[in-house]
């Protein structure tokens, strides 16, 4: 059987780092308040000339180089983002152009913070269906452009950045010891769309709008939804939490991460946490955390890695991948 194997990984962050203390002159908050409630200490904020496309392209180049490939080897560019450069064409097409790719196809996928999980799952289906051999999967965001910088409950939470992986078709044996994606489960429930959304859009207000969130409601649903979809992935493979080498969750809030790991009985030392230095980068969150753990030597070839994320909609999902 065909498996989608991770061939390369890369990331990119804006130059500007904004620490918690930098918010004290903008809104009523403090470093202690932010750290205690979120675990965030700093985040990167896009500056002049740094866009979703430029960050996504930089992460993509790094992933392709890490894979030992050329841009011309890529069949599909799949970008997960909620902050595209333009309403259309897709920012994935712009990244395709930046990379000099003139073959294959490219499109955007929008599932907010779950975007990268949705994108990996979609890429896996294209690979296993024979429509693509190598897929560049990117999560890139510039949420700083849709924040209400007078709302202290949201503006302190988010950062900008991009992460990317190259998935490649490889022959597997149908075993959980195979390298590549072993299971993926996606969910959504539109009944919760008012709990996390942006209050603008082309067909309604003709504006970009700002992010709005009912933080307590999101927290209340997050742990249960995340653990349920992970359990479905375990059930599909016969694997358990004890088999996991690394848990790479969406980096939204350390309290949600800790509660999810505890409910799943995953040891703290197996949890990859970068929310302290990146904040919530939405669709870029999981690949940025992955890239960090690969770069520092934690995630190695053959490791079983559990990915998960939850975002506005609500949307949520989980992926089990053998590195």
Swiss-Prot record:
InterPro entries: ACP_syn_III_C, ACP_syn_III_N, FabH, Thiolase-like. The keyword Cytoplasm applies. Belongs to the thiolase-like superfamily. FabH family. Residues 251-255 are annotated as: ACP-binding. One of its GO terms (molecular function) is 3-oxoacyl-[acyl-carrier-protein] synthase activity. One of its GO terms (biological process) is fatty acid biosynthetic process. It holds the Pfam family ACP_syn_III_C. The last Arg residue of the ACP-binding site is essential for the weak association between ACP/AcpP and FabH. Its EC number is 2.3.1.180. Keywords: Acyltransferase, Cytoplasm, Fatty acid biosynthesis, Fatty acid metabolism, Lipid biosynthesis, Lipid metabolism, Multifunctional enzyme, Transferase. It comes from Brucella canis (strain ATCC 23365 / NCTC 10854 / RM-666). GO terms for cellular component: cytoplasm. This is Beta-ketoacyl-[acyl-carrier-protein] synthase III.
